[in-house]
Swiss-Prot record:
This is Hydroxyethylthiazole kinase. HAMAP family: Thz_kinase. SUPFAM superfamilies: Ribokinase-like. Pathway: Cofactor biosynthesis; thiamine diphosphate biosynthesis; 4-methyl-5-(2-phosphoethyl)-thiazole from 5-(2-hydroxyethyl)-4-methylthiazole: step 1/1. InterPro entries: Hyethyz_kinase (IPR000417), Ribokinase-like (IPR029056). Substrate binds at M43, G199.
Length: 285
């Protein structure tokens, strides 16, 4: 996994500016995760300034978690500006399929902005791919969760969406999938506690912004690096909390402690550790 180590170390060296137009539930988590990954976050969301902010940034992350008419316009303006400047744009279609506003907003975004990557849970990706998937709030339906038995079908759905949009498609879950027209990969890093804190998916998109910001011409590799890095950090955080030999010893605690330890683990993660722990395999289709 040398390429992942190289990308993560490049993020640390170059500190890419990542512009996030995200939801107010996890905006602080995303900003801190960008910092932990080695980037520099800016969370501006007013349409009057987003073009200027995009010009200063290396990547743009759009998250529709808490939509309103003001931020929808900001997303469109920022996305078009990023496209005109050749800067990668990440879409996190939170709650796709849950409401008419989300669906119409996604239709506009996908029609007017070219995305380097689209990251969502299995229900969200299934909805965008035209499958019969419905949202359960911002979480995936149980019938859509990615398991070993459903891995190939989920990968095929992700690849279909990639081919129709030109974006690398990431399906988040217990097993993560990264797909594009050239193939699909399974990432088996992470820990169940990641699903017990709000914002872990949003943080993943933010880390993708960091990696794409330094490797815009290696989009699949950048997305794989981001997904595996956050997963490895999640594993280390759990090991640290329960006393399995983490750097800080066994601290105990619950989900609040885990959230902080996840940031700690990402901030301490280096390319060597990522390369040795990343569990990425190609999905045969």
């Amino acid at each position: 996994m040398t390429v992942f180590a190289d990308i993560l170390d490049t993020v640390r060296r170059h500190e890419p500016v990542v512009h996030c137009i995200t939801n107010y539930v996890t905006v602080n988590d995303c900003a801190n995760m960008v910092l932990a990954a080695g980037g520099s976050p800016i969370m501006a969301d007013d349409a009057a300034e987003v073009e200027d902010i995009v010009a200063l940034s290396q990547a743009l992350v759009i998250n529709i978690g808490t939509l309103n008419s003001r931020t929808v316009e900001s997303m469109l303006v920022a996305g078009r500006r990023a496209n005109s400047m050749g800067k990668p744009v990440v879409l996190d279609p939170v709650g796709a399929g849950a409401s008419a506003l989300r669906n119409s907003t996604l239709q506009r975004l996908l029609g007017e902005v070219r995305f380097a990557a689209i990251k969502g849970n299995a229900s969200e990706i299934g909805f965008l791919a035209g499958k019969d998937a419905k949202a359960r709030g911002v979480d995936a339906q149980d019938s859509c969760l990615v398991t070993e038995d459903r891995l190939e079908s989920a990968a095929a759905t992700a690849r279909h969406l990639s081919e129709s949009t030109g974006a690398v498609v990431v399906v988040s879950g217990a097993i993560d999938i990264v797909a594009y027209s050239g193939g699909a990969w399974a990432v088996r890093n992470g820990h169940p506690l990641m699903a017990r804190i709000t914002g872990s998916g949003c943080m993943s998109a933010a880390v993708m912004g960091c990696c794409l910001g330094v490797a815009p011409y290696e989009m699949p590799q950048a997305c794989l690096c981001a997904v595996s890095a956050l997963g490895v950090a999640g594993e280390i955080a759990a090991e640290t909390m329960v006393g399995g030999g983490g750097e800080m010893g066994g601290l105990g605690g619950g989900t609040g402690s885990y959230r902080a330890l996840l940031l700690d683990a990402m901030s301490l993660l280096d390319g060597l550790a990522l390369g040795s722990r990343a569990d990425v395999t190609r999905i045969q289709m």
